[in-house]
């Protein structure tokens, strides 16, 4: 029988989940498990918009969100969207219906800027947006209008009023009484502040901006979990540090191809993500320092070493993966506490044991899969 971690041993406050590289590292999966571990009463988005896809696999089916944070999936927690996040009302309501979320469980800040159909059309017409691997969600165009103070706000739209609430007040109240999760978007390498030139997203996505985007009190932070993908990937163009990339043929041969949610506009087929052959340690060091990482979640370890596929015990991790963990800890100064080893939501090896996963959580996940 595996040891489980007791939420009573996890002090109340804020857990922030951020990605070290260019996204697609499994933030949503890690957020969902930390929400379960800490018995989080709220899961919040604090930056970005409806473009960045967060998802997990359950019984071979893919469960994803674009607008909502994914961390609520295994808990009955409240779902919140802070003023730092752009909201597409159509996607918001579609996800509420799909996940059977009643209006009293979803809260958005009155100051959230709203994505319009014109924002989406503007991005679709942009050759630059196609080149950098944009999801064409309209988030960038919406945020540009926000800077110009011309974007519509949630408080101005009548049908959104049942969902509108002051998110800073709500988040800080919940963090004082228990635990909450703040879920970032994309990754450090795509930060508008710290990424590479024009090959970035429309906002900053680091710990500081997620915190500000929710309006949460920094004194309530208990942990910052930095998600480190064993073999980092990137959508579209832009540098990936001083590390050689796999060719598509090499990825196919090794069975480590990752298909994107972004499709080729001409063929309609999913793009294949670019994949580095290792970690650029200078980038990881910067990501750790700027985000203030207190612990590390290592993801996609099975792409680094197939021998650990679906391993769920720390003692079963291979020397190759354990050596990678040592190097990551040496560079970041933070412990690796969890290793993701496969596609399934529970392909995880916890250093201190596994959070208890009961029939309640399993039934909840199962309810999200269409019959």
Residue ranges and their predicted role:
Residues 2-371:
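Non-transmembrane, aqueous-exposed alpha-helical and coiled segments at domain scale
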């Amino acid at each position: 029988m595996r040891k489980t971690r007791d939420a009573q041993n996890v002090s109340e406050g804020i857990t922030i989940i951020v990605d070290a590289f260019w996204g697609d590292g499994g933030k949503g999966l890690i957020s969902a498990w930390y929400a379960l571990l800490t018995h989080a009463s709220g899961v919040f988005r604090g930056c970005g918009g409806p473009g960045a896809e967060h998802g997990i696999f359950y019984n071979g089916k893919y469960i994803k969100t674009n607008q909502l944070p994914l961390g609520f999936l295994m808990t009955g927690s409240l779902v919140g969207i802070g003023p730092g996040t752009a909201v597409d009302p159509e996607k918001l309501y579609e996800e509420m219906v799909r996940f059977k979320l009643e209006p009293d469980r979803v809260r958005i800040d009155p100051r959230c800027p709203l994505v319009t159909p014109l924002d989406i059309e503007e991005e679709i017409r942009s050759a630059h947006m196609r080149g950098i691997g944009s999801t064409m969600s309209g988030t960038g165009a919406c945020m540009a209008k926000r800077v110009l103070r011309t974007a519509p706000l949630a408080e101005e739209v009548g049908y959104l009023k049942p969902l509108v609430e002051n998110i800073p007040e709500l988040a800080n109240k919940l963090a004082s009484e228990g635990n909450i999760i703040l879920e970032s978007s994309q990754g450090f390498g795509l930060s508008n502040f710290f990424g590479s030139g024009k090959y970035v997203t429309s906002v900053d996505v680091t710990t500081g901006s997620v915190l500000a985007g929710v309006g949460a009190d920094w004194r309530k932070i208990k942990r910052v979990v930095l998600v480190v993908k064993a073999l980092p990937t990137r959508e579209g163009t832009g540098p990936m540090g001083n590390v050689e990339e796999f060719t598509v043929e090499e990825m196919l041969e090794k069975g480590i191809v990752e298909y994107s949610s972004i499709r080729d506009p001409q063929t309609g087929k999913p793009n294949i993500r670019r994949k580095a052959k290792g970690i650029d340690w200078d980038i990881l060091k910067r990501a750790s320092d700027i985000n203030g990482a207190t612990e590390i979640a290592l993801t996609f370890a099975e792409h680094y070493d197939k021998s650990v596929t679906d391993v769920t015990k720390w003692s079963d991790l291979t020397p190759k993966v354990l050596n990678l963990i040592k190097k990551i800890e040496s560079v970041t100064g933070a412990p690796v506490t969890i290793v993701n080893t496969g596609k399934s939501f529970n392909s995880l090896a916890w250093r201190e044991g596994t959070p208890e996963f009961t029939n309640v959580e399993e039934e909840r996940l199962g309810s999200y899969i269409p019959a």
